[in-house]
Amino acid sequence: MTYFEAFFLALLQGFTEFLPISSSAHLILPSEVLGWSDQGLAFDVAVHVGTLAAVVMYFRKEVVTLLSAWTFSIVKKEHNKESKLAWLIILSTIPAAVCGLMFKDFIEVYLRSAWVIAITTIVFGLLLWWVDKNSTLVKDEYEMTWKKALFLGIAQAAAMIPGTSRSGITITAALYLGFTREAAARFSFLMSIPIITLAGSYLGLKLALSDAIIHFGFLGTGIIVSFISAYICIHFFLKLISSMGMTPFVIYRLLLGTSLLAWLALT
């Protein structure tokens, strides 16, 4: 890996982690299309740390409120809408955590390919477009129920398939349930905090138990660049969807998917 590759991949991770266009697809493509070597376990941990820090920093007020309410619901048995939402975020994390433990190796071996990415990019892009155009979008995140949270959790688990997009499929599921675009995005981003924490911790444990060589310059680049780009991305995404909806991201997914299919057919 070079510093240019580290910068480019971290920028890619930061800009795509929270957009409905699949960060995993964009990180796989450089190795598939450009022939770049795998970025390595340590770099994966670094960009997870950067994007996690970005979403926590952006939603710091909400995170503090939810954590406080959740703590009081346990210690003092005080329950309110914030503690309920915190518990529902935890519930929504369970399906992805379980599926990650059960199917991660299978997905890495059989589904991590450019063909799968091309197809899922197109299919789930069209699904996002259809749901965005045909659903009644009136609910906010505090109208979440345990059944809806579990449904979103199952959607998040399906995002393990490369090209699906974690934010894309969870936002699609939330729109289908009638949540506004802004509420769907906010809940999707809040859902990402525990799952990115779990994924980063798992990768960190693997790194600690491995003999991998750690290049702290690349790690620092990964953390800083992914943090800045993810923070900017979250800010502008939340402003953009209120006026333009999901159409720009659907168009991008269709262009990416069809271009990738064409490239695969010609090589």
UniProtKB/Swiss-Prot annotation:
GO terms for cellular component: plasma membrane. It catalyses: di-trans,octa-cis-undecaprenyl diphosphate + H2O = di-trans,octa-cis-undecaprenyl phosphate + phosphate + H(+). Its main location: membrane. GO terms for biological process: cell wall organization; peptidoglycan biosynthetic process; regulation of cell shape; response to antibiotic. The chain crosses the membrane at residues 1-21, 39-59, 87-107, 111-131, 149-169, 189-209, 218-238, 246-266. It holds the Pfam family BacA. Its EC number is 3.6.1.27. It is found in: Cell inner membrane. It is a multi-pass membrane protein. Coiled coil: none annotated. GO terms for molecular function: undecaprenyl-diphosphatase activity. InterPro entries: UppP. Keywords: Antibiotic resistance, Cell inner membrane, Cell membrane, Cell shape, Cell wall biogenesis/degradation, Hydrolase, Membrane, Peptidoglycan synthesis, Transmembrane, Transmembrane helix. Belongs to the UppP family. Catalyzes the dephosphorylation of undecaprenyl diphosphate (UPP). Confers resistance to bacitracin. Bacitracin is thought to be involved in the inhibition of peptidoglycan synthesis by sequestering undecaprenyl diphosphate, thereby reducing the pool of lipid carrier available. This is Undecaprenyl-diphosphatase.
